[in-house]
Amino acid sequence: MKKYRSRSVKNIIEELKVLQKQGYKIVAFEDDSFLADKKQAIQLFQGIINEKIKMKFIATAVRVDSSDEKLFSLMKRAGVTHLQFGLESGNQEILDFYNKKTDLKKIRNAILLSNKMGFFTIGTFILGAPFETKKHFEKTINFAKSLPLDSVSFLPLKYITGSELWCNAVQEGKISEYEYIVYADSKRNLGFYTFEELISICNKGHREFYMRLSFIFKLLIKSLRNDDFGFLQSYITLFFSNIFGTFRFLGFVKKTAFYDS
């Protein structure tokens, strides 16, 4: 089991005060399991309120099982505007494969709560599990479209050094121990689809999600309701980065995926 050292609430608050003095307006909390420790999260956001830190915050990698109306209300008061959830898949068997310890109903409830409370809600999905098929992809894309999300990202699966997926692939001889990041690719017997095919499927998912008139209308209403066209600006930025950015992503990844031993 991996060990980690968390920062104290006091330490984070002090850094935020420094950033505010330096003129920063927006801060993103980058944490692979943000809100996992609810007690610490409550102390952090209450501390932000008590210290009168007037900034906007983006919370990344929010856990579905950490979704709580009281906690979300406190986060809203503290200045959190965006919540990003790692949802991974619209298929229960794939969620189980990734050991997500959640289900589709809990995911839907978490996204509904986030949307209800007015957060700009982002969901990320991973495509390319070893046994994932076209039907799985279609189900995930349709599941994403059925949720009240303000933004999505469909990304190809990557095997990262030290992860269970990576360790298993190394033991099976599919990945060298010197390769620190490897993307799913049937050319290497990592799944049923080539990396290029996965990128194409991700692009398809983005087009289907963002090109819906109902989605565009909903975001316009949300921008007006919040009297904050930052929502709309976020959409425009995310729209172009997701629709067109993945083509650049393809060229970038091929240059950076492997470690030169």
Model-predicted regions and their roles:
Residues K3, V27, M55, S151, ...:
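Secondary-structure transition/capping residues
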Residues K38-K39, E93, F97, L127-K135, ...:
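Flexible glycine/acidic-rich beta-alpha junction loops that bind and position SAM and/or redox cofactors
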Residues K116, N142, S146, K204-R207:
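Charged/polar positions on well-ordered alpha helices
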Residues E164-S261:
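Radical SAM enzyme core and accessory elements
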Residues M1-I122, L127-A129, H136, N142:
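Radical SAM [4Fe-4S] cluster-binding motif and immediate context
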Residues Q22, R63-F72, I94-L104, F125-P130, ...:
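Hydrophobic transmembrane alpha-helix bundles
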